[in-house]
Each structure stands twice: as structure tokens, then as C-alpha cells.
Amino acid sequence: MLNGITSERLLEQRFGGKNVVYCVAQGMDAVKLGGALTYTVMGQLCIGVPSAEKLPALDAVCALFDRIGMPYSREDDILHRLWGKFMLNVGVNQVVMVFEGTYGTIQAPGRPREMMIAAMREVLELSRYEGVKLTEDDLNFYVELMNTMSPKGMPSMRQDGLAHRRSEVELFSGTVCRLARKHGLSVPVNEWLYARVREMEAAY
């Protein structure tokens, strides 16, 4: 799986539009360090399709998940869910990496939590120009979701930083900055996060 709001289009270019079911994985706090994978919350897959021509593929995936007992939610508006998860990742992943922390870092009051919410709010504003229209209720939902994570857990970008791997920053603040330029919007928090992550990666 790829995070962000461009991944499904990339997959459609490779595998054909009718063969790609849109998916968002959310609610898990898995951490993979070396060969060890740990989690306290399994989460679920949110799946859906943006058009009726893809419904047969969605039905097939739902049937498979029912057979194997995979936790999932069938979404009526998968694009809204995709953007919601994007908003979450832009805030949580990047801020925890930059502050070299854990979920506990953004669960506690302070600058990291404030920066997370500010970065998310820039995505909320941007979504309105992209026809998705996230709301404050969406933002609050994802902030509360983060409060349920293990304080000792960490998102994928922080794990990338610890392993000195290239991160998903282009999929997150990179995308935000590109779309903001397209619409003439100001996104100073994401611009700072992008520059800081690139600086950290250059020091590996």
C-alpha cells in the first residue's frame, strides 16, 4: 500500500482503472523495527470505489474479506475518507518524525500537537479547492483517533527516520505544497515540515 492521495491513480496507470479498489488503512499502531512487528490496535481497512463501474471489483474484495475475517469498512464516499487519512498523515507522520518522538508526543499538549493540528488544517482548507470539502468534524475525528493510539507507538515516517530510509514526505507535504501552489494558497506549516524532513534525510 501507498499513503497519500495520488497512490490510487498511480496504481490505475499500471493495472487499469477497473482493477483498483481504493483503500485506506487506519486505526492501527503497528511498529516494525528490524524484523519485529508489534501492535496493540489492529485497525481496519476502509475500502470503496469512486464510480459505479468499479463496483464488481469492490464486491469481490468485500466477499474475500468476509471469508477471511479481515476487519474492514465499506465506504460510500471513499475520496472523502482518502483525504481524511491524508490529512491525518500530513499532521501525525511528519510532526512525529521531525520531533523524533512517538504518538505520545502529539497526544500531550504542546508545540508538536499544535503543529500537527495546524498542518492538518492546511489540508482541510486545500480539500475545499479539490472538491472534497473536509470539515472541522473530520479534523476532530482524526485528532481523537490519535488519542487512542499507544503512546509508545510511532507512525511510519518516524520508523523511516530511525532506519535512515527515505520517507513519504513527497506524498504528504510535497503534495500539499504542489496543490497549494496550484490554487494560490499559503501552507507555511507544511512548507516548514517539508524542508525540515529533507534536511534530516540529507544528514543520513
Located regions from the model:
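Rossmann-like NAD(P)(H) cofactor-binding subdomain of soluble oxidoreductases
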Residues: 1-36
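Short glycine/serine/threonine-biased micro-segments
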Residues: 2, 33, 41, 46, ...
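Internal alpha-helical scaffold of NAD(P)-dependent oxidoreductase catalytic cores
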Residues: 14-21, 34-136
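NAD(P)-dependent Rossmann-like dehydrogenase/reductase catalytic/cofactor-binding core
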Residues: 56, 66, 115-204
